[in-house]
């Protein structure tokens, strides 16, 4: 159950426009059809307990449960409605989530995030202002871009990122170097130290980068079909019939990914409390796996029973391996979409250089390039930190996150 101090903080999520929109209707889809607000991650799935009773009480009409066994809430993939999954009554295999394009959000969601009525940053420092003393402005040579290679590995990623590096050199007239790192914490440190000038950070670590490294987030990626971002999914194995809701998690071995991860820890810590009255570290012991891949694999092989995960991360992992399938996982809840990790630049770069850097992402069609192949993004759109990241910052405020390097 929720401690009093958590209960007092609930209004921080529900009191804002996004939280109110989330409660307005049980939409479950990639946008909130009952509101102009996006409500990223603050899904209005109704009532905390959400249908965790009736484990194995007969069949559900699709062959998944009969004779007193099976998950009576598990539906056939064909029954999934991305506009209204009805999580309080339904579970689905991960294959249904993927096949119905529920992994990401839509352009309308991203636009609504940017239209939120937000006066100031919800948690932490506002964006840093450029130095008033022009002598403190930086015009680096070479220009260093820091990023974390994806599943394809460092060598393949370097080939795929080369079109970006070439475009940066063309736009800025500078030599551009790519610095690969093994974690987002290393990305933040490279930017903080001034060793790197541009970078790609994750959604959850964006506020750490702003507060610790004095960066400005300016662009987020969108796929060619207009989809963007990712969702928080609460997953288990398909054969775990007894787990039908996040409300069932306290009885099982739950894994989170990393402390600073938005979908892997920060968001579920707030939203599981909000919608299921389940408080991580109070109702169950949080065991960190070390990352989304580790959580997904650990659940598949039985090291863990269930946990939160980033939708695009598990999609990429399953697509990259032959030993696990989408049908191996069951989804018992999904959030509204979160924005993807942004592109950032240090605050103290020469203004003209900043404009050249922005143009590379915002004015280039990346369709058909290796960069699109690696990132999944054909286009990048301009973002405003205090608005597009408002819901993430509200979640981090709820969790009383302190922006210190030791918390990354």
Regions found by a protein language model. Give the residues of each.
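Active-site glycine-rich loop that binds ribose-phosphate moieties when present
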Residues: 270-274, 280-281, 288-292
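Terminal disorder- and signal-encoded targeting elements
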Residues: 1-183, 193-197, 203, 207-208, ...
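Domain-level signature for soluble enzymes in the chorismate/prephenate branch of the shikimate pathway
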Residues: 219, 241, 259, 287-301, ...
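Short helices/loops that flank or line small-molecule/ion binding pockets
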Residues: 185-199, 212, 247-248, 292-312
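A conserved helix-loop-strand patch within extracytoplasmic ligand-binding domains
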Residues: 220-275
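Extracytoplasmic "Venus flytrap"/periplasmic binding protein-like
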Residues: 213-221
């Amino acid at each position: 159950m929720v401690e009093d101090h958590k209960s007092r903080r609930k209004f921080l999520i529900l009191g804002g426009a996004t939280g109110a929109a989330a409660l307005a209707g049980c939409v479950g889809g990639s946008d909130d059809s009952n509101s102009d607000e996006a409500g990223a991650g603050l899904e209005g799935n109704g009532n905390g307990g959400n249908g965790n009773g009736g484990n194995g009480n007969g069949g559900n009409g699709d062959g998944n449960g009969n004779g007193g066994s099976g998950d009576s809430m598990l539906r056939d993939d064909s029954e999934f409605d991305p506009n209204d999954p009805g999580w309080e009554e339904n579970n689905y295999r991960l294959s249904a989530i993927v096949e119905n394009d529920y992994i990401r959000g839509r352009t309308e969601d991203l636009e609504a995030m940017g239209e939120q009525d937000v006066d100031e940053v919800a948690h932490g420092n506002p964006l840093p202002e450029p130095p008033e003393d022009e002598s403190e402005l930086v015009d680096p040579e070479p220009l260093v871009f820091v990023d974390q290679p994806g599943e394809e590995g460092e060598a393949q990623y370097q080939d795929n990122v080369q079109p970006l590096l070439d475009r940066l050199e063309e736009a800025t007239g500078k030599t551009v170097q790519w610095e690969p790192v093994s974690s987002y914490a290393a990305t933040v440190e490279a930017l903080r130290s001034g060793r790197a000038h541009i970078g790609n950070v994750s959604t959850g670590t964006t506020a750490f980068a702003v507060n610790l490294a004095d960066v400005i987030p300016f662009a987020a990626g969108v796929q060619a079909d207009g989809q963007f971002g990712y969702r928080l999914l609460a997953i288990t194995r398909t054969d775990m019939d007894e787990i039908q809701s996040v409300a069932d998690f306290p009885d099982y071995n739950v894994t989170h990914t990393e402390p600073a991860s938005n979908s892997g820890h920060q968001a579920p810590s707030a939203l599981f409390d909000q919608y299921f009255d389940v408080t991580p570290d109070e109702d169950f012991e949080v065991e960190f796996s070390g990352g989304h891949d580790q959580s997904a694999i650990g659940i598949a092989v039985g090291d863990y029973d269930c946990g939160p995960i980033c939708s695009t991360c598990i999609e990429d992992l399953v697509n990259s391996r032959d030993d696990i399938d989408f049908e191996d996982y069951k989804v018992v809840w999904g959030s509204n979409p979160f924005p993807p990790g942004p592109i950032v630049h240090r605050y103290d770069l020469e203004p003209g250089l900043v404009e050249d850097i922005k143009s590379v992402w915002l004015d280039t069609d990346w369709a058909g390039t290796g960069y699109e192949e690696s990132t999944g993004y054909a286009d990048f759109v301009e973002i405003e930190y205090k608005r597009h990241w408002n819901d993430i910052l509200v979640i981090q405020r709820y969790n009383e996150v302190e922006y210190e390097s030791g918390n990354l």
